[in-house]
């Protein structure tokens, strides 16, 4: 049995005063009372432009990649799974990929998802990128190119460079690029980690260049060098191509997830990537808001929906 219950508020938890008030309720066991409408009556939900989802998500001759980003807990996993199922039901062969070690797509789909693509239902497959396995595979691929061409001292230096903290993330990035390049799937949906981690992955093409150069310098064949360099350029081009890659932000209408999503959008823009869809999750329908608790919470949400617009 829980020793204390933390009740969902009718408003966001923000500021010292609000935290102090909630702490008193939490540790005294006093339940919150919603006797009045504390907030100004909400205006109508702002009219939000609805994009043509099929045009946005369905492929047009090339593999399409869909990335869902956002603060932890906003519903990325559920929305990624729903999106993948929606596309698969259209007869499109779809792969759902998670790069977040804490993701629960297997629990949402009610199936076991491992490090190899598993068939979930008609046209839908799912896979979880095991970062440790991806790291070992990535590291070995680079070192195998260098063995027999460099001294043991040089190989040791390269291995030390590959053991840097960001290489594991680079390996995960390289793995999901492989899925995009894989012609077996028409659409690849990525249930990504919380925003900061995802943006770190999206910064990798620029750090990745250094390790591409390692592979290039280790290769004697001019053809191998050109292939590695062209692949790197293609990765950047694919991420920036709105027809091939769609970045979506998932949030709920409160201050913190909105600000985090806004910063992510600006960071993407700086990298030459446009956010094409914003999903506002957990919005209360007006018809269920029949008491002060729900009315207050909806008033807050409508205010933030206006900001999102």
Task: Describe the residue ranges of each PLM region.
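The conserved Walker
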Residues: 72
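C-terminal lobe/tail of nucleotide-utilizing enzymes
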Residues: 1-63, 240-245, 252-309
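Conserved lysine of the Walker
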Residues: 76
């Amino acid at each position: 049995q829980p020793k204390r219950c933390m009740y969902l508020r009718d408003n966001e938890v923000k500021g010292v005063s609000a935290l102090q008030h909630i702490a008193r309720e939490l540790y005294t066991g006093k339940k919150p009372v919603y006797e009045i409408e504390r907030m100004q009556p909400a205006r109508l939900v702002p009219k939000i432009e609805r994009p043509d989802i099929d045009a946005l998500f369905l492929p047009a001759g090339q593999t399409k990649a869909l990335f869902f980003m956002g603060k932890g807990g906003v519903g990325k996993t559920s929305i990624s799974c729903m999106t993948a199922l929606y596309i698969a039901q259209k007869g499109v062969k779809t792969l759902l990929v998670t790069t977040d070690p804490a993701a629960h797509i297997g629990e949402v789909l009610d199936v076991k998802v491992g490090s190899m693509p598993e068939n979930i239902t008609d046209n839908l497959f799912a896979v979880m990128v095991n970062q440790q396995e991806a790291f070992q595979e990535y590291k070995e691929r680079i070192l195998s190119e260098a063995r027999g061409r460099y001294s043991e001292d040089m190989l040791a230096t390269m291995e030390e460079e590959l053991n840097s903290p960001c290489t594991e993330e680079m390996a995960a990035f390289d793995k999901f690029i492989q899925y995009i390049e894989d012609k077996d799937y028409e659409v690849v949906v990525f249930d990504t980690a919380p925003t900061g981690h995802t943006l770190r992955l999206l910064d990798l093409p620029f750090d990745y260049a250094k390790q591409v150069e390692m592979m290039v310098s280790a290769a004697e064949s001019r053809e191998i060098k050109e292939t590695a360099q062209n692949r790197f350029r293609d990765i950047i081009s694919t991420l920036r191509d709105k027809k091939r890659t769609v970045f979506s932000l998932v949030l709920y209408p409160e201050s913190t997830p909105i600000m985090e999503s806004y910063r992510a959008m600006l960071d993407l823009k700086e990298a030459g990537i446009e956010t094409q869809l914003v999903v506002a999750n957990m919005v209360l329908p007006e018809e269920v808001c029949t008491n002060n608790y729900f009315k207050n919470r909806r008033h807050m949400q409508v205010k933030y929906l206006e900001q999102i617009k």
